[in-house]
């Protein structure tokens, strides 16, 4: 078909006829591409359905293990680490949090798609079957809209038939495996949600520990400067310098308190924003899969 399109100029047709024929060839190529795409999707779907029961069971088992495992407090796990080391772990956990949010979004998408698939797929299959019947009638009659079919337009209709047939096969397989895919989505959702809840708490506890260590360092500095000021009582120069250091240390302590407060507020705000973003994504997904459905028209 691509060769026919490449050599269309060799037919030396009038410009209008050549454009019409070019359109037929391009549409036929597009239909062949759609058929191949749906056949690939069908093969991928069959593999997904083969793997899904095992993946569902693994997710359920991992969730059971996770819920049965004791949570070791952050203060116990990381008590000996320095602030920079804790900040590195905090950064890594924040990255993990983003990955879990993506996984949760994917699981939600799988569930929502499975919930709305029966109506959408059955409607599409019905419309596709009607179109195949129309094409069969056209091919049998040898005419389309009163015009006799040419070999090229006949090939286009045959390509459309094959493309629709591949789509019907895909939708039927989706319907047959729908409950399997929904079970997988539910298992993944429950597992990722548990991981997300635990990770959110760990991030909060890490931030609290970082704040505590920062404050302890500042307090240690203040105490040290106060002791030096007491020792320098006999020297006016040293006393003045020590007094200045005490003031600076006190400022450091208050600044640390403020930094900790702002950091904690920022963490809470970011987690709230992540929650809102997750809700928006879920809503967008629901609207997307419901577009054109009877259910949406009733809402």
Predicted regions and their residues:
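Flexible, low-complexity extramembrane segments of multi-pass membrane transporters/channels
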Residues: 1-299
């Amino acid at each position: 078909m691509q060769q026919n399109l490449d050599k269309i100029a060799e037919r030396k047709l009038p410009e209008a006829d050549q454009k019409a024929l070019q359109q037929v060839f391009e549409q036929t190529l597009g239909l062949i591409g759609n058929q191949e795409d749906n056949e690939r999707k069908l093969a991928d779907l069959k593999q997904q359905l083969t793997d899904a029961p095992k993946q569902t069971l693994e997710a359920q088992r991992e969730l059971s293990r996770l819920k049965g495992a004791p949570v070791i407090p952050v203060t116990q796990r990381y008590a000996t680490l320095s602030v920079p080391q804790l900040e590195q772990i905090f950064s890594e956990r924040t990255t993990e949090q983003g990955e879990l949010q993506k996984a949760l979004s994917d699981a939600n998408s799988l569930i929502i798609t499975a919930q709305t698939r029966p109506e959408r797929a059955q409607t599409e299959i019905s419309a596709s079957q009607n179109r195949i019947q129309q094409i069969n009638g056209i091919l049998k009659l040898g005419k389309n809209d009163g015009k006799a079919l040419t070999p090229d337009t006949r090939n286009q209709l045959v390509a459309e038939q094959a493309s629709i047939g591949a789509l019907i096969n895909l939708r039927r397989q989706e319907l047959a495996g729908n409950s399997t895919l929904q079970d997988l989505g539910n298992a993944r959702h429950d597992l990722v949600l548990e991981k997300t809840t635990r990770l959110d708490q760990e991030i909060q506890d890490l931030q609290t520990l970082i704040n505590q260590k920062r404050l302890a360092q500042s307090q240690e500095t203040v105490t040290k400067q106060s002791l030096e000021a007491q020792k320098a009582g006999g020297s006016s120069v040293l006393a003045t310098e020590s007094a200045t250091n005490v003031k600076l240390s006190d400022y450091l302590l208050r600044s640390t308190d403020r930094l900790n407060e702002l950091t904690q507020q920022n963490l809470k705000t970011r987690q709230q924003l992540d929650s809102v973003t997750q809700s928006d994504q879920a809503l967008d997904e629901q609207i997307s899969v419901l577009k054109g459905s009877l259910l949406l028209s009733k809402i």
